[in-house]
UniProtKB/Swiss-Prot annotation:
Record-listed UDP-N-acetyl-alpha-D-glucosamine binding positions: 93, 162-165, 307, 329
Source organism of the structure: Actinobacillus pleuropneumoniae serotype 3 (strain JL03)
UniProt-listed Enzyme Commission number(s): 2.5.1.7
Reactions that this protein is recorded to catalyse: phosphoenolpyruvate + UDP-N-acetyl-alpha-D-glucosamine = UDP-N-acetyl-3-O-(1-carboxyvinyl)-alpha-D-glucosamine + phosphate
Similarity comment: family membership: Belongs to the EPSP synthase family. MurA subfamily.
Protein name as catalogued: UDP-N-acetylglucosamine 1-carboxyvinyltransferase
Gene from which the chain derives: murA
Biological pathway: Cell wall biogenesis; peptidoglycan biosynthesis
Lineage: Bacteria, Pseudomonadati, Pseudomonadota, Gammaproteobacteria, Pasteurellales
Chain positions found as 2-(S-cysteinyl)pyruvic acid O-phosphothioketal: 117
Amino acid sequence: MEKFRVHGPFTLSGTVDISGAKNAALPILFAAVLATEPVTLTNVPDLKDVDTTFKILRKLGVVVERDESGAVQIDASKIDHYVAPYELVKTMRASIWALAPLVARFHEGQVSLPGGCTIGARPVDMHISGLEKMGSVIELDEGYVKATSNGRLHGARIYMDKVSVGATLSVMMAATLAEGTTTIENAAREPEIVDTALFLNAMGAKISGAGTDTITIEGVERLTGCQHRIVADRIETGTFLVAAAVSGGKITCRGTKADTLEAVIEKLREAGMEVTVTEDTITLDSKGQRPKAVNIRTMPHPGFPTDMQAQFTLLNVVAEGISRITETIFENRFMHIPELNRMGAKGEIEGNTAICHGVEKLKSAEVMATDLRASISLVLAGCIASGETIVDRIYHIDRGYEHIEDKLRGIGAKIERFSTKFEE
């Protein structure tokens, strides 16, 4: 099993080129199944979850190729298989996005119930009910969700009982080829939904309202080829800004957009950090100052993103003062706190709230990553702790951060990957 060995404390400073967003790349890759012609995607991050998506697409009969420049060509014109199998789907919850494009274009699709990070309940019910309202028949059989339709799906008014990024994307994809108009109310507003809509429209879809809570899709008969650049990863951006804030450094994130990260930037400024933005850069200068504690409440976009909660937990455990962090999106998403406490942090969990008592310094320890965002907070903790920290189960990080140790070394971290022969 691979681990990271991280030495500290070090100040993290420099410039980081931000990768394409995993949370846009995955739905866009699955949405390419809707097209009868090849599509070309650029700025696709080199990640485990992207590789898994390639494997699922190839199982369906899609031709997927990545060239030397990193551009990805996808040709879904000869799909001959409609099942996303358990052995691939089990590692990644995003696999559910294979279902809507298959049933929309081919009137049948089958996806194993998905896996991924262990952070509480993420039911697929809203994906399923959306497809049912559009005329699909859904069966659950031996761990698989099977969707069929008698001809084209039909447009429908779909109200989301809970704001759901995943279900909004599923319904939006399916509706592009449906007969008639579909309206999604109480839709998620994340930038990755906007990017997916831009991609679908480039293929000939008729989507309006993405980025608001009401999305309207007029169905078309077919979608064609296009070229599209994946939006920058706002969570990777926020992660590196926090790296500067907790280490007393100054970091510029290049190739990113501040308007996708307003809630995070506001909280960093509240923590006493100087943040400056240009059209495609964000710079955080801590001026060597310890951050001030900030209260956080995770919310759907444009609120504070749940995927930045673990990083701000780290900020708060080394900040001046006491803070409360309330997690409203996912259950069981404070598993990093006991690990940070092993490093000398003072964090308490009360239901869906964490209380952080800031300490001046962390000390090294052997810690275990539990999910994607928790794992990066432990790596950053290792960068600012005295001594050698070992971070176990780093496969979580490879699912969502491209070339992370290279990027961290580029801003002054001392980090290496190593393997152990036996899993304890």
